[in-house]
């Protein structure tokens, strides 16, 4: 059974923070051979949130939601990740559904943005994201900016 959690950054304890940083490093830095500073100063500020999926006390899926203080800046979903041990279980779909739901619940009138690896454009399109930029290089991997407008009728 999977334990899904949607936490404000202030709710993260040290073991949880360690687990999410470890998973991000394992996949984004080591597996994808992409040396970059993952700890970017955005994890523990403002209204930022963290979505976590746990099974047997192991973090198996994660996403970060960044809410800027600027009301004109879209809410950003990023660091979307499923551990190697849990791939093939459709957790990415469940994770993105929960990420979009969290954004709609917390910031219903805000558009959403994500920087997608270009080959995952169709995956994110199923959640209402459309291309917002041309394809660009980020750390040697082709990416595309994608945006999702708020659903009509949503109120703050």
Residue ranges and their predicted role:
Residues 1-58:
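Short amphipathic alpha-helix that is part of the acyltransferase structural core
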Residues 67-77, 87, 106-110, 138-142:
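A conserved beta-turn-beta hairpin within the catalytic core of GNAT-like acetyltransferases
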Residues 52, 58-67, 74-76, 81:
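Conserved beta-strand in the GNAT
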Residues 149-156:
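Generic C-terminal helix-cap and adjacent flexible tail
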Residues 96, 103-117:
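Conserved GNAT acetyl-CoA-binding A-motif
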Residues 113-115, 125, 130-145:
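Conserved catalytic-core motifs of GNAT/GCN5-like acyltransferases
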Residues 40-45, 69, 137-138:
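A short beta-turn/loop motif at secondary-structure boundaries
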Residues 82, 88-101:
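Conserved acetyl-CoA-binding loop-helix of GNAT-fold acetyltransferases
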